[in-house]
Amino acid sequence: MNFALTDEQVFLREAARGSLSRFKTIEAARDALEDASALPDLWPMAVEAGWPGLLVDEEHGGAGLGGFDALLVAEECGHVLAAVPLIGLLPATAILDAAGDETLAAVASGALRPAYVPARPPSEREPGWTVEPASGFARSGAPLAAADGNQMTLDGSVFFVPDAPGADLLVVVAIDSGGEPVAVAIEAGADGVTVEIVMRYDATRSLANVSFTGARGRRLDVDAGVLEDAWYLAHALIAAESIGAVQTCLDVSVAYAKERFTFGRAIGSYQAVKHELTEVLRRLENSRGLQYYAGWARRDQPEEFALAASAARSSAGAALDFAARAMINVHGGIGATWEHDAPLFFRRAQLSRRLLGGTHDATDRVAEQTLASAAAAAA
């Protein structure tokens, strides 16, 4: 297991950073709190960089890269709070690629943007495939899919779907009449499909409630393992974006601690500040190691990917929550005002920790699998 980046991965990361640097994404994130149209359209940039085809095989016009590479791109997006729809895009393309779908060439070229409509895989606490609740904590079952000739008819709703607004194709995880998970590709504008944009705490996130009423789509030929992989890939992507945001929180806070003086000393010389920022660094390095492990496991040790992605999501979510609060603390009064970037990262932390089951769900998954492994070893 070698987590050192290859020359190609370093180039990919630097290219992503360079592409994103052309846009004032953090300034736009602040303006978008009042006017959503202030966010720049980053989709053309993503297409130019080849991101829609990151996980698509080369034979279909994609880059044929792996999860590790995709997480590097996601981390750079998180670094500058860029509103690039990777969480919805890449799990959807992974499912389409596994199915060898006819739309792959259009997806890889960026002519067709898919979005993943997720369902949570079964666990010890919840044995079925479930979706986010509209409110409260009780999760409901995934949409129902009924066979209708060569197509599937969908009924049901999925709430708080990342990157669904503006998508052309929805890749939906549903359950069939036998209770088995299926993937259905359906046009976002098809009859019986409603994509309702919802207000979000973090203006850089695009969310929608998606409803199906007798909507017809085509079944994708994939098994449950592919659908589980897509769920955990989404978790790993959220973790990577969070890690990028933690890095920015740390960099900005350290720079301020060096230049802000009080009582004749830089505030960074005081133990209260030093210890808090050291804890941010510790959490950052721990989370990045787990992110790299998840990226490696998806290709080289797929049976460990669920645990690795859950661990990365759990660690990175807690790290960003801590780092965003530390950023406000270090900056004092100015850190709590809209003139500063700190509240933007705090908002990102609070919304990210709640998406797709939330950080707590990932933590529960780690606990379940760790305890199960310990019990098996003791048996």
Question: Model-found features: residue ranges?
Answer:
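Alpha-helical interface subdomain recognition
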Residues: 1-80, 152, 232-379
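Short, conserved beta-strand segments within well-ordered enzyme catalytic domains
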Residues: 52-56, 72-74, 85, 115-117, ...
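Glycine-rich, Trp-frequent "lid" loop and neighboring beta-strands that shape
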Residues: 63, 101-186
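N-terminal glycine-rich flavin-associated loop
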Residues: 83-101
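Flexible, small-/acidic-enriched active-site or ligand-binding loops
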Residues: 128-135, 160-161, 187-219
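Well-ordered beta-strand segments characteristic of repetitive beta-sheet solenoids
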Residues: 170-172, 211, 243
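Adenine nucleotide phosphate-binding catalytic loops in nucleotide-utilizing enzymes
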Residues: 220, 224-226
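Select transmembrane alpha-helical segments in multipass membrane proteins
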Residues: 227-231
